Design a protein with these regions (language model features):
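Conserved catalytic cores of phosphodiester-cleaving nucleases, focusing on short active-site segments
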Residues: 105-106
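Basic, Lys/Arg-enriched alpha-helical interface segments
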Residues: 1-88, 97-102, 111-136
Length: 136
């Protein structure tokens, strides 16, 4: 029930912001979650979900801070970074190169070490490759 309320509030904010931005002629980012990314978010504690969705919303509104949304080195993968109660949540994503304002979130992890696991980056790159192959 709480998830539905949070989602509705987030959608209402997105709708109102999109109306304002359309009137002002501002291009807004759109973040799309894959099923796996959505399942990851749904499995997290409610307060952590709120914080992750809040960070996604901030990026959609154009806040591009490195502590929230960062490009990983030597790759086309980006990560949404959320720290809540000492736990680091990462949501991997990539830009749709045909639509400048579309970001696809592939999957997420709870980060336990300082270094981002290479297998998770490879997984995100594979999903990206699949996405573009299916678009052709």
């Amino acid at each position: 029930m709480k998830n539905r309320i949070l989602y509705r509030r987030l959608e209402t904010k997105r709708y109102l912001c999109s109306i304002i931005q359309n009137k002002m002629g501002i291009n807004k980012l759109k973040v799309v979650l894959t099923e796996e990314a959505q399942a990851f978010l749904d499995a997290q504690p409610f307060k952590a979900q709120q914080k992750i969705y809040y960070n996604i919303f901030k990026v959609e509104e154009g806040v591009m801070k490195v502590d929230i949304f960062k490009k990983l080195e030597n790759t086309e993968i980006w990560e949404f970074r959320t720290l809540y109660n000492g736990i680091c949540y990462r949501l991997f994503s990539f830009w749709d190169t045909e639509e400048e304002t579309l970001v696809i979130a592939t999957h997420g992890i709870v980060k336990k070490t300082q270094k981002t696991p290479l297998k998770e980056i490879a997984k995100a790159e594979e999903i990206r490759k699949e996405y573009f192959n299916n678009k052709k």
